[in-house]
Amino acid sequence: MDELEKNGLTRRDFLKATSTAAIAGALFMGDPRAVIAQAVEKKTRVVLVRDKDVLDEMGNIKPEVLERMLDQAVTTLLDENDPAAAWKRLIKPADIVGIKTNQWGHLPTPKALENAIEKRVVGAGVPEKNISIRDQGVLDDPIFVKSTALINVRPLRTHHWSGVGSLIKNYIMFSRTPWGYHDDSCADLAKVWSVPEAAGKTRLNILVVLTPLFHGIGPHHFNPEYTWPYRGLLVGLDPVAVDSTGVRLLVAKRKEYFKEDRPLNPPPKSIYMADTRHHLGTADPEKIELVRLGWEDGILI
């Protein structure tokens, strides 16, 4: 019996884990040699819900459809039939709730989604006075400072410093010196999740993929040519798993658009490192259960 078998790991398991780790390394680090061999573990669930009717002919959001999508995602994530019951598992009446959004001018968190989340939090028994919705200024917001629960919600896009604007990156406003995380393609962004104002508080992560931005060059890049009406939400309890799935979506869209492999630049190291260095969650696609709901045309992943 060799060392692999002594540890309960067959050669087949080892080869599978090694190959999937290589894929993950290539995806997030831009380097297929970034390999960490791990045995297969229980998968973390991410729900992708899409609805072709969530956007009208002008690209405007239909709030009632978006609210229904949110309910479908959360009930599926938690194996519940009733949205109210699902939210009561996430949020308790005594909670003080910060809804951390993103207000980047070209692609903000939709107001309709903020409203839908707040409606469900209130429905779980939280008074409106104990809820705050904001992006910047969270460290000066008394609700966020005293919060017992956070909901993390932002759109998916490419990003000049970190490769992707992600759920992990969305908490950078919990630092008074966010520029301090820019080194090495923002590889250690997950550190900010350990500050007292954020640590252990996140109940739900929602990555908005209604009209993601899949390409751009420069610090403030935005060209609507590089967005597309994907009409979806990615939802999970694990921010790393949701972000990892978002990266897969962007990579697939870039390949479809450019007709060749076009890696994200810079590579989204922060997502891989959030798993392997900071142990915030799971980045390996082989360890993620992706549940797909709704519209299937052009799903890409």
Where are these regions (language model features)?
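N-terminal and secondary-structure boundary signal
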Residues: 1-301
